[in-house]
Design a protein with these regions (language model features):
Chain A
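Short, solvent-exposed loop/beta-turn-alpha elements that line the ligand-binding surface or hinge
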Residues: 116-131, 178-181, 199-200, 204-209, ...
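Long, aromatic- and glycine/proline-rich binding clefts that accommodate carbohydrate-like moieties
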Residues: 144, 308-309, 358-414, 418, ...
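Glycine-centered hinge/linker elements that transmit conformational signals in sensory
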Residues: 190-194, 234-266, 310
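Extracytoplasmic/periplasmic solute-binding protein
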Residues: 141-155, 160, 186-238, 282
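Conserved N-terminal structural module of periplasmic/extracytoplasmic solute-binding proteins
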Residues: 1-111, 121-127, 177, 314-316, ...
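Extracytoplasmic/periplasmic substrate-recognition and gating elements
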Residues: 66, 87, 250, 254-260, ...
Length: 449, 287
């Protein structure tokens, strides 16, 4: 390199300017980041919640600050970020999770705190007041639904139930489903085929949507409805070849094949049922009670909307599972456990819980809050009546702790479309799913040990 | 029957007009194609949820829902998140433009053993997907105590960006060597040459670099989502995640209205600085 020393004052000036720019930019931020007005400020212990924006409004956070004297810092739920935080040893104090599929996964990896001692001394979250749905957050090292509690559901629905639009039933002359007796899955599909409306090859009205909260948990639930279990006894493998799982898989593939509702091969541009149902373009929607939160905001839609019991398989048991049970769990390495528990109690038993219960977006997970569920309007009374009757059939469909549901769903989405298009038999699909999913489950089991 | 033909000049004029007509038609069609998604976004922001989900498609809203924009603005602390985005984007764009210019100058005008290999490594790093480094990035910043601060953007800014380095390198390599030689004869060192001669010449590239870096940061979702808490996060994250109903499902019409407001600053900056941007891209040898 040619050597030409620069004049010292210019070098200093340049370095000073460069460094000054950097420092000024950073110093302007007070070495920190700027906060939007969440209303959270002041001193006191800080509890970090990894949640979604709909879980807590800024107003409720402000209220918590006042009521509990605890500063709440929220980070958006993100699995990559969660794993990174757990790896780094600084996890959030409370984390959002789907009880049905996350509870066993995190408990088996020993990263979740057992909450039994906290529940035992709580006067707000009394054990005798907990709805059975909270058992989704129990895991005894082998089976979900038993053993210590690792979290709690904020609200829930029985996700095999479905809503229907009476106006669209009237239009096509299909009889309304019974409020008390479930239709069979085969009847549900027949109805959907009669209700679907098409124009110039385009589906203008979906006959019915039936996709559960995710394919993996849906198929777990459908197999349970057929009288079987998708997983082997130790949850280390799936078995789509068993008669019950084969029946469940075959039904779902039939549903996709006849194109009466959204599926991987016929996706709904709205990405979920709500807007399509709201636009009177879906005669039946496999959403549980929670969709009532949306329906209640549209009086005209509410007038024509009814909730129906979960279908059954011919000869199968009558069960009605919860595929979600979304709530919070506490990482074992949480730094501020006592303060986190105070927030936990407040979130599940006080103002936020009451707001959720009266909003109609789910069934409260404390029995004592049931009286807050919307029941002023006639349609709300009908919905509540059907829902209360359905609670008698509630059951837990246990999920494997050895894989994240997203991983199994991804495998399903890669392999199943060929069967949905009729290019692969259901038996072949079952074999291929067994092979690919069991490989992933094997790796998961090795990690858990 | 008499066959009349146009005089040669008129025929040429007609041919030019026809060619121009075809050209403009194609340009208008292509422009429409590119503007289509943005137009759809604007229309989606003006519809009710029912109209947005209607089939057959309602191209134009029956009743324009102007309030969607007001709702989207008030539902979240829009200005607060916009301020956060602006601060991060300004810090990063300013610092990375200066640092990339400095590195680009080095690669263009200085010689040292291994320069070509280093430049190859630099270009090769452009091929590394950001997702691969996501996890270690978080761990590094967490160990340094920089999570939930804007320091990562300061450090990223000071580290130069390979694409921008390439942009500056191409531009500086094209400047006449006489400029540099004259400065050397006058006793200037390379820092002075860069600072007093090359940098003032490079306004088109500087503005192009600034716009590119600003747009990257303004539009980045992954880094702020990974490193910042909700209160310190940016508009990109807020627009993507905050417009949800009680079940966490997106409210598409509000999200569309918010997205329109979200892209306005970028459009304004580009409109103001577009001459410099275009000149910068064309004088750097990249087209």
């Amino acid at each position: 390199m040619p050597s030409h020393a620069g004049a010292p004052p210019s070098r200093r000036r340049f370095l000073a300017l460069s460094a000054g720019g950097a420092v000024a930019g950073a110093a302007a931020l007070s070495g920190c980041a700027m906060q939007v007005s969440s209303g959270v400020s002041g001193s006191g212990e800080t509890v970090t919640l990894m949640i979604n924006p709909d879980d807590l409004t800024p107003e409720l956070i402000k209220q918590a600050q006042k009521d509990l004297g605890v500063k709440i810092r929220t980070v958006k739920y993100d699995i990559t970020k969660l794993i990174a935080m757990l790896t780094n040893g600084n996890p959030p104090d409370l984390v959002r999770g789907i009880g049905a599929v996350d509870a066993a996964y995190f408990a088996a990896r020993d990263v979740a705190e057992e909450l039994d001692p906290y529940f035992a001394r709580s006067s707000i979250l009394r054990l005798d007041d907990l709805d059975p749905v909270n058992d989704l957050w129990r895991y005894d090292g082998r089976t979900q639904g038993k053993g210590p509690r690792y979290g709690m559901a904020k609200d829930f629905s029985q996700d095999s139930m479905y809503w229907y639009n009476t106006a669209l039933f009237d239009k096509t002359g299909v009889d309304y489903p019974s409020e008390t007796e479930p239709v069979t899955y085969e009847e549900w599909l027949d109805n959907a085929e009669r209700l679907v409306q098409r124009k110039n090859g385009q589906t203008t009205v979906f006959g019915g949507s039936y996709n559960g909260l995710g394919k993996a948990i849906l198929l777990t639930s459908l197999t349970a409805a057929a009288g079987g279990n998708l997983f082997t006894d130790d949850f280390s493998q799936v078995d789509f070849s068993s008669p019950e799982a084969r029946k469940a898989l075959g039904w779902y593939i039939d549903y996709c094949r006849v194109r009466v509702g959204p599926s991987i091969i016929d996706p709904d541009p709205n990405t979920w049922d709500g807007p399509t149902y709201q636009a009177n373009r879906m005669a039946m929607s496999n959403c549980g009670y929670w969709l009532g939160g949306l329906i209640n905001t549209a009086p005209k839609l509410a007038e024509v909307s009814r909730l129906a019991p979960a279908p059954v398989f011919e000869g199968g048991p009558r069960i009605s599972t919860c595929q979600g049970g979304t709530g919070l769990w506490m990482p074992r390495k949480a730094r501020n456990k006592d303060a986190a528990w105070r927030v936990f109690e407040w979130f599940f038993g006080e103002a936020p819980a009451k707001a959720r219960a009266s909003g109609g977006w789910g069934i409260p997970t404390l029995k004592s809050l049931r009286s807050l569920m919307p029941a002023q309007e006639e349609h709300q009374k009908q919905v509540l009546k059907v829902q209360e009757a359905e609670l008698k059939h509630f059951s837990v469909a246990s999920f494997t702790p050895y894989a994240k549901w997203e991983g199994l769903e991804s495998i399903f989405n890669q392999i199943a479309p060929a069967a949905m298009r009729g290019d692969m038999s259901v038996d072949t699909l079952a074999r291929r799913l067994n092979s690919a999913m069991n490989e992933q489950l094997k790796r998961g089991k090795e990690q858990v040990g | 029957m008499t066959v009349t033909s146009l005089p040669p000049k008129s025929a040429a004029r007609v041919r030019v007009r026809v060619n121009r007509l075809v050209l403009y038609t194609v340009l208008v069609a292509v422009t429409g194609l590119f503007l289509g998604p943005f137009g759809w976004l604007v229309l989606a922001g003006l519809k009710s949820p029912e109209e947005l989900a209607a089939s057959p498609v309602h191209w134009l809203p029956d009743t324009i829902q102007w309030h969607n924009f007001a709702d989207a603005f008030h539902l979240i602390d829009f200005l607060g998140y916009a301020r956060n985005s602006l601060v991060i984007a300004l810090i990063y764009a300013t610092l990375v433009t200066l640092s990339s210019a400095w590195v680009g100058f080095g690669f263009a005008r200085l010689n040292a053993p291994g320069k070509k290999i280093l430049f190859g490594i630099l270009l090769g790093s452009m091929m590394l997907p950001q997702l691969i480094t996501l996890f270690p990035t978080y761990l590094i910043f967490a160990k340094l105590g920089m999570v939930d601060t804007y320091w990562p953007w300061v450090l990223w800014g000071l580290s130069a960006a390979p694409y921008l380095v390439f942009l500056f390198r191409q531009f500086f390599a094209g400047l006449p060597r006489e400029l540099e030689e004259a400065a050397i004869i006058d006793g200037a060192g390379y820092i002075q040459i860069f600072w007093r001669i090359f940098l003032p010449q490079s306004w088109p590239v500087l503005s192009a670099s600034f716009i590119i870096a600003f747009t990257w940061t303004w539009g980045d979702y992954i880094a702020p989502q990974l490193l910042l808490s909700t209160d310190h996060s940016t508009l990109a994250v807020a627009v993507m995640t905050t417009y949800v109903n009680g079940a966490g499902a997106p409210v598409a019409n509000l999200q569309a209205a918010a997205s329109v407001m979200y892209v306005v600053p970028i459009l304004l900056i580009f409109l103001v600085a577009q001459r410099g941007f275009v000149a910068g891209m064309s004088t750097s040898g990249l087209k």
